[in-house]
Amino acid sequence: MIAVIVIAGVVAVIRASGGGTKIAGRPASSGPTTTLRDGAVAGIDQAPPATAAPPRPAASAPVALAADPTAAADQLAIAEVTIREPNASPNELDAAAHLQQVAYRRLGQHPELYDMIISRAPAALRTAVAHNLYARNDLALIPGGPLKDTLPAWRIVAPARQSELLADYRDAQQQFGVGWNYLAAINLIESDMGRIEGLSSAGAQGPMQFMPSTWDSYGAGGDINAPRDSIMAAARYLAHNGFADGNVDGALYAYNNSQHYVDAIKDIAAVLALDPFAYRAYYRWEVFYVTTLGDVHLPVGYDTPERIPAADYLAAHPEAG
């Protein structure tokens, strides 16, 4: 078994006070993965399909999310289009991914607004927006205890290169029959694609959050903290639990014993299968930790060996609130 219920990555970070509300109507998954004949992943190695009459692309500088939900939904739509713009600069992608992440974190807490939010997106992107909203809702429903007024004993580091992680996901898919998009989704939720270094409250470790005893069985002698070794071990574990034989839900549930976790992974994987260009946005998502004082941004360079008061950190770093 991997980390049960409490995860050190995005699950722990994105949970909102009061939890979420289980909602129906999740869009159908579009299959394990989407690949091209030559082995390239559609949308990453080739230009994404154009959307009809897209809004003007997002600015390259960070933009604050509007307080009005409709205006925020319009900003999210612009960010989603920019992410899929083949000529978007790295700065534009950074800004769009940040706005996208903040929008889903905030708007995702309000299922009563989902229909409105989805309708504001271009038609070609509405399924992806719906999957992201449902994933946010499911992550909020994973039990994790009361919110704390302290920040975790973590070290936040830059992730491995986007291309290197993608190559690792692909290699694992080829070797073990586990879709690259599922591995990317797990890596995102467990450790924000390797940004979080530190133990979960359950004692799980590394980019894919293995318990040491499970690592002994599936790590193949590798380094639990090495991205490639951890990704390969996750694929090995999922394959052992039936993923490659079609038991996707069962394999994911074995990885983390929560149906909400399973559903969230499947939603994110579905976005990547529908349009893998979305990967370059997920790769840019940063670490936020929910406290009694609200979301706190933990940037690369955050490093504390023990929990610290959130109020003290925010006083020293007001931009993190």
Summary of predicted features, one role per range:
Residues 4-16:
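Hydrophobic alpha-helical membrane-insertion segments, chiefly the h-region
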Residues 8, 19, 297-321:
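Extended low-complexity, intrinsically disordered tails
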Residues 24-29, 37, 42:
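Intrinsically disordered, low-complexity segments enriched in small/polar and acidic residues
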Residues 29-36, 50-52:
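Extracellular mucin-like PTS domains
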Residues 41-53, 57-65:
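Non-catalytic protein-protein interaction scaffold segments in large eukaryotic complex-forming proteins
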Residues 112-299, 309-315:
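Catalytic glycan-binding domains that act on GlcNAc-containing polysaccharides
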Residues 13, 18-26, 56-59, 63-66, ...:
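N-terminal export signals and maturation junctions of secreted/periplasmic proteins
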